[in-house]
C-alpha cells in the first residue's frame, strides 16, 4: 500500500491507482511484463507516470475536422431519443375532441404539416417524422400492399383537379383500411 500512497497524493483520486499484483507472481509468465530479453510482445502500453495521469493525450482527442471526416454520413444535431412503446400506443389511442380515436387522416395531416423548424436539429426532425409516419401508416398492423395503397391514394388526391378531389374525399370517408 505504501507504493500507492504517492499516486493518491499526486492525483487525488483513488481511481488512478494501478491494481496491485500478488507478491508471488512470476515475471516470466506474465504477458504484460516488460522484461529485458522477453520474446513476448507487450500486451498493453506501460503505465503512465504519476505526474502525467491528469494530462490528456493530444492524440486521443479528435479535432472537429477529424471527427467530421471519420463519420461524414452521420446526420448533425442532437442524438436520437427513443420513444417508449407505451407513449407510442397512447399517441395512437388518444381520443379526439368527440371522444373517438384519432384516425389515419389526422396522423397523415400531422405528418404532412410537420416543418423542420418544429424540431431541434436534423436527427430530431427525422425521429419525429418517423414517429408520425408510423402513427399514420401503422406498419405494425398493415401489410406492405395496404401501405402502398394509402400512399398512392394520397398522391392521387394531390394531383387531381379540385372538383374530382372533392368527390373523392366525400367517398373516402366510407372507405377505411383496417388491420
Curated annotation (Swiss-Prot):
CDD domains named in the record: SCAN
Key words of the record: Nucleus
Pfam families: SCAN (PF02023)
Subcellular location: Nucleus
Protein's UniProt keywords contain Nucleus: yes
Residue stretches of biased makeup (Low complexity): 60-80
Record's keyword annotation contains Nucleus: yes
Top-level taxonomic group: Eukaryota
Chain segments carrying region Disordered: 1-108
Ranges for domain SCAN box: 108-166
CC terms in the record's Gene Ontology section: nucleus
Quaternary data: Interacts with ZNF202.
Role played: May regulate transcriptional activity.
Identification of the protein by name: SCAN domain-containing protein 1
Organism (species): Pongo pygmaeus
Organism classification: Eukaryota, Metazoa, Chordata, Craniata, Vertebrata
